Amino acid sequence: GGDLFLTKEKLWPHLPELVDGMLQFYRGVLPDFITSHYADGGYAAALTFKKTGIPFSFTGHSLGAQKLDKLGTTTDNWLSMENRFKFSKRLAAERISMKYAAKIMVSTKQEMDEQYAHPLYISALDQFDKTKFEIIPPGVNENIFSQTPALTDKTLKQKLDAIFGTKGGPVILVSSRLDEKKNIIGLVQAYSEDNAL
């Protein structure tokens, strides 16, 4: 942290070296599939794919084209924005990730239809081929995850009940930064207005 913290943009030139080092470290025991996140992870996965043929998924999370638009980037401020955020490298990495990914993971149809259809991504993937996308909405599949409490669950429940009371409804865990676009207020509102919850 502090003055020793490096922004991720400063690490971009080292991603090919990271991939080479990773392949050397794991030689002979490579995975069958890679999951990648954000532009830098997608780029590293694409480099790995080109060297090994190992397919990968790409989850963009926060795409550069939307950030570029949100920040109001124009021809007048492009140089300062580029120097700070390295948009040209990020957008190129996202386009490469989209092109070579076996699957692109999104959480909503809107994300697929609007964010990935941004003009800066048009030639990176076939906008009409929705089979490349996998929509995985936020939440937990209760058919997969056990509802039978373990001993550690019971201990934790006692601690949480002491703090929050014993209403007995389902717990919702939110793990994200406090950002308006994460719609945490909408989650709290939906939870508080539903009598079953």
Language-model features, listed with the residues they occupy:
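Catalytic cores of nucleotide-sugar-dependent glycosyltransferases that transfer UDP/GDP/TDP-activated
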Residues: G1-L197
